[in-house]
Amino acid sequence: MSKVCLLTGKRPIYGNTVSHANNHVRTRFEPNLHTKRIWIEEEKRFVKVKLSAKAMTIIAKTGTATLAKLLK
């Protein structure tokens, strides 16, 4: 699986790490992804998905209905 959040679409971005001496080094910034088993009440089953920390907050606030719409 790729390093992409299913709900928010966050993916790695590229940029520079800049030191105190202003040296620029190219780097890849990874999203804060976690693999979770989420119970989808509408389908009565568990779904294993990769979610960012922000997506887990969205699911906690709005419920799994938003995730169920994406999986259909």
UniProtKB/Swiss-Prot annotation:
GO biological process: translation
Gene Ontology, cellular component aspect: ribonucleoprotein complex; ribosome
Keyword presence, Ribonucleoprotein: yes
Keyword Ribosomal protein appears in the UniProt entry: yes
GO molecular function: structural constituent of ribosome
InterPro entries: Ribosomal_bL28, Ribosomal_bL28/bL31-like_sf, Ribosomal_bL28_bact-type, Ribosomal_bL28_sf
Keywords annotated in UniProt: Ribonucleoprotein, Ribosomal protein
Entry-linked Pfam families: Ribosomal_L28 (PF00830)
PANTHER family in the record: 39S RIBOSOMAL PROTEIN L28, MITOCHONDRIAL, LARGE RIBOSOMAL SUBUNIT PROTEIN BL28M
Entry similarity comment: Belongs to the bacterial ribosomal protein bL28 family.
UniProt name for this protein: Large ribosomal subunit protein bL28
Protein's organism: Pelodictyon phaeoclathratiforme (strain DSM 5477 / BU-1)
Gene: rpmB
